Amino acid sequence: FVNQHLCGSHLVEALYLVCGERGFFYTPKAGIVEQCCASTCSLYQLENYCN
């Protein structure tokens, strides 16, 4: 997994893959859009949004 731009449905799909059964806390206010869509984010950064 290399750092990627993830926006919209791609971002949600990536969170489902990374978090699995834990689920995730998704809110645009958390900065995930800025981190992963405007810039790039890593698998490790995505894991920060898992429950």
From Swiss-Prot:
MF annotations from Gene Ontology: hormone activity
Protein's organism: Balaenoptera borealis (Sei whale)
Role description: Insulin decreases blood glucose concentration. It increases cell permeability to monosaccharides, amino acids and fatty acids. It accelerates glycolysis, the pentose phosphate cycle, and glycogen synthesis in liver.
Superkingdom assignment: Eukaryota
Name of the featured protein: Insulin
PANTHER family: INSULIN, INSULIN/INSULIN GROWTH FACTOR
Annotated family: Belongs to the insulin family.
Broad class of the protein's primary localization: secreted
Pfam family, one: Insulin
Disulphides: C7-C37, C19-C50, C36-C41
GO BP annotation list: cellular response to oxygen-containing compound; glucose homeostasis; glucose metabolic process; positive regulation of protein secretion
Sequence intervals crossing the membrane: none
Keyword terms of this UniProt record: Carbohydrate metabolism, Disulfide bond, Glucose metabolism, Hormone, Secreted
Subunit structure comment from the entry: Heterodimer of a B chain and an A chain linked by two disulfide bonds.
InterPro entries, per database record: Insulin (IPR004825), Insulin-like (IPR016179), Insulin-like_sf (IPR036438), Insulin_CS (IPR022353), Insulin_family (IPR022352)
One Gene Ontology term, aspect cellular component: extracellular space
Subcellular location: Secreted
